[in-house]
């Protein structure tokens, strides 16, 4: 049984959204940076006795695309909100900008928070000027809880560490939300509540 699903990936420019999507869907890591306006990818993901036909939408994080970006949010089942583990400003923008935009434009949609470029934090990034500026796992977990994310995952597109876990978490969050909504509808508003809290994979 195929289940269609739409997940939109958002976050500041240059945090690694496109690299994450390309590596996951094509096993290819891009060598040159090019700002994305909008793009989408598709992949089939097994989920229990079902196969999720996962449509992944890549968006531009730059401010000049702010008025167009929400057009991609229409009928989204969930979101992956990404920040760069070596860039504290990108982490700060999660709560200052991104979660506010998602809650305003897509209220109720589940959000998976993702810290990208894990390889730079783990692989001696101090010589690149990152050093202690890197975001620690506990900080990302705390941020995930603060914004009400379904899960917090740290990954590297380059090494593919935890890369699959990002999209597995997104699919799981969306499927659980659908099931909770279905039960709620069946019981005329008295149905089950979704799982609370924020899981973490780092």
Label each region the model flagged:
Residues 1-181, 202:
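TRAFAC-class small GTPase G-domain
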Residues 186-202:
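Polybasic, Ser/Thr-rich amphipathic helices
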């Amino acid at each position: 049984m195929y289940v269609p699903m739409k997940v939109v990936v958002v976050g500041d420019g240059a945090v690694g959204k496109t690299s994450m999507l390309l590596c996951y869907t094509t096993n290819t890591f891009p060598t040159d940076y090019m700002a994305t306006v909008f793009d989408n990818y598709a992949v089939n993901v097994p989920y229990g006795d079902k196969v999720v036909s996962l449509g992944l939408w890549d968006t531009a994080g730059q401010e000049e695309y702010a008025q167009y970006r929400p057009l991609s949010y229409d009928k989204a089942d969930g979101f992956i909100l990404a920040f760069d583990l070596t860039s504290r400003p990108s982490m700060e923008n999660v709560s200052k900008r991104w979660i506010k935009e998602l809650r305003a434009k897509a209220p109720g949609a589940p959000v998976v928070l993702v810290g990208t470029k894990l390889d730079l934090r783990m692989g001696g990034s101090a010589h690149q000027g990152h050093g202690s500026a890197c975001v620690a796992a506990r900080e990302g977990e705390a941020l995930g809880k603060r914004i009400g994310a379904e899960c917090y995952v740290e990954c590297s597109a380059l090494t593919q560490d935890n890369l699959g876990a990002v999209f597995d978490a997104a699919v799981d969050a969306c499927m659980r939300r659908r099931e909770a909504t279905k039960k709620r509808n069946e019981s005329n508003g008295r149905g089950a509540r979704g799982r609370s809290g924020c899981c973490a994979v780092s």
